[in-house]
């Protein structure tokens, strides 16, 4: 009787005690990627309303596989480490950008992240060599195009069928993991 009471009291104490503030939340450096020591750390209190900072900082828009990809909504030719200007960020709530401009910049940034088509290693890489290659290969591509047009394209039904199969397999695996964890939990509680 005492042991479960002590364990539950300990869990409640750990859950309700204020945690030390996170360094990532405290640092408000001008560059997001740079690790800097906080100049004037403040303890974060989640029960009181947060004050709005005077100068809004840009935030990451996409997170993929633990890496941050920043959508540079201003000049997309800048280096990837260049910070967003506060006027160009849609998260700051500025009314300077029209929604269609923001959407156009968003899609342009997404297109930049798409992988480029790959070419064989033995193909020439210079623009003049590519022009000569295009002139020579245009004659060779005609039979290849005819062959490609004769092959039936992969139907969308097949694509969606394969997608459904993969999703069903993932769902079955998730249910198996859940059943395993439930069995372990029942063994622990039953003892």
UniProtKB/Swiss-Prot annotation:
The UniProt keywords, alphabetically, are: Amidation, Cleavage on pair of basic residues, Hormone, Secreted, Signal
Q: Where is this region: Disordered?
A: 115-153
Name the tissues where it is expressed. Answer: Produced by the hypothalamus.
Biased composition annotated in UniProt, kind: Basic and acidic residues? 141-151
Q: Name one GO biological process term.
A: positive regulation of corticotropin secretion
Its biological purpose: Hormone regulating the release of corticotropin from pituitary gland. Induces NLRP6 in intestinal epithelial cells, hence may influence gut microbiota profile.
Q: What is this protein called?
A: Corticoliberin
Higher taxonomy: Eukaryota, Metazoa, Chordata, Craniata, Vertebrata
User: Gene name on record?
Assistant: CRH
């Amino acid at each position: 009787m005492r042991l479960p009471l002590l364990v539950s009291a300990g869990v409640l104490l750990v859950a309700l005690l204020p945690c030390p503030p996170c360094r990532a939340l405290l640092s408000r450096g001008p560059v997001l990627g740079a690790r800097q020591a906080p100049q004037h750390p403040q303890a974060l209190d989640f029960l009181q309303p947060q004050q709005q900072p005077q100068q809004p900082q840009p935030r990451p828009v996409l997170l993929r596989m633990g890496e941050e990809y920043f959508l540079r909504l201003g000049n997309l030719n800048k280096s990837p480490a260049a910070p967003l200007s506060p006027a160009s960020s849609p998260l700051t709530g500025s009314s300077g950008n029209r929604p269609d401009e923001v959407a156009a910049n968003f899609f342009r940034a997404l297109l930049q992240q798409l992988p480029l088509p790959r070419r064989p290693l033995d193909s020439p890489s210079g623009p003049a060599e590519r022009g000569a290659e295009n002139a020579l290969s245009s004659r060779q591509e005609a039979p290849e195009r005819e062959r490609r047009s004769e092959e039936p394209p992969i139907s969308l039904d097949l694509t969606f069928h394969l997608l459904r199969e993969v999703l069903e397999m993932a769902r079955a695996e998730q249910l198996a993991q859940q059943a395993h964890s439930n069995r372990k939990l029942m063994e622990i509680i039953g003892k």
